[in-house]
Amino acid sequence: MLIPILLCLASLGAEPVKLRYPEKHSLLVVFDAKGDIVPVRSAQDWAMRRSHILNSMHEVMGPLPTKKVPLDVKVLEETAKEKYTLKKITYASEEGDRVPAYLLIPHKIVGKVPAMLCLHQTTSIGKGEPAGLGGLPNLHYAHELALRGYIALAPDYPSFGDYQYDFKKSKHASGTIKGVWNHICAVDLLCAMESVDKEKIGVIGHSLGGHNSLFVAAFDERIKAVVTSCGFTSFPRYYNGNIKGWTSDRYMPRLATVYKLKTEYVPFDFPEILGTIAPRGLFINAPMEDSNFEVVGVKECVAAAQGVFRLLNSRTGMQAYYPECKHDFPNEIRRIAYDWLAKAFEN
């Protein structure tokens, strides 16, 4: 089965990775030095499989930049709220590119505290929604986390909010990898803050922010806890395998230009991404009636990845909730998620 997939990709003009896993839900297997698929029996075995997954993601998304620039954080506005200070800032992610963001800092900080990267959904106001300045109240999670004592950073995704960005002129292979890089730089910003506990940094996001939370956590292991809401299903379950929605400039154009919208050609899938996060904590909100991300596919992804969390003896593990609602992050599930975060960050 493996060889035909490689041949098909070669005929499409792709440059496939050497190791192609035919079954993306079978995570506890790995190619050995001889090129044979063998069981994953140890953390070392999994580290090899994980590296193959990240390479496959790069094949679709493109590479990350190899050089960082100084963050050069600039504060544009500062507003004193009842329990925190809201700063409108920008930070540099690349030469000539600055990311607008809101930084929420609780008033009464003693010592070092946890910090959360808060990623917005598809909305014109971008970062303003998680910061509590508009949009849907159920998605004001940066505001709510700041009230709970977290430092919260909510950046704009390229082309949303105040972030003007021309994907056509971008040097990146995908909007997705540009977003990942911006979010890695956001973690750099949090790590540079004296009041942030660098061992207690997490990420939370809904929809667009839900899958971007997974993507950045896959590539940045400084992120110790992930909360993803309405962010994924397996590619074959996404609109019955019609993955065109993933192919815009904001996402991964190669899914169309190289892989011709054929899910069987795509070298990675979401069960594998979930696995890359282990042994760190992962909290999933996947509503039963989410028309964007079909819940059966979510459950299949979760079932496939659980073995990795067990293999690595994850202290926090992976928890998934399936509320009876549509594409939403309900009050009760957010409360459970926040309680879960508090436990994940316990010493």
Model-derived regions: residue spans:
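N-terminal cap/lid segment of alpha/beta-hydrolase-fold proteins
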Residues: S51, E59-G111, A115
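Conserved strand-to-loop "acid loop" that flanks and positions the catalytic carboxylate
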Residues: A278-V295, E324
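Cap/lid segment of the alpha/beta-hydrolase catalytic domain
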Residues: G111-S195, F219, Y239-N240, K244
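C-terminal catalytic histidine-bearing segment of alpha/beta-hydrolase fold enzymes
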Residues: V302-N347
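Primarily recognizes the serine-hydrolase "nucleophile elbow" in alpha/beta-hydrolase
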Residues: R148, C185-T257
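Sec-dependent N-terminal signal peptides
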Residues: M1-A10
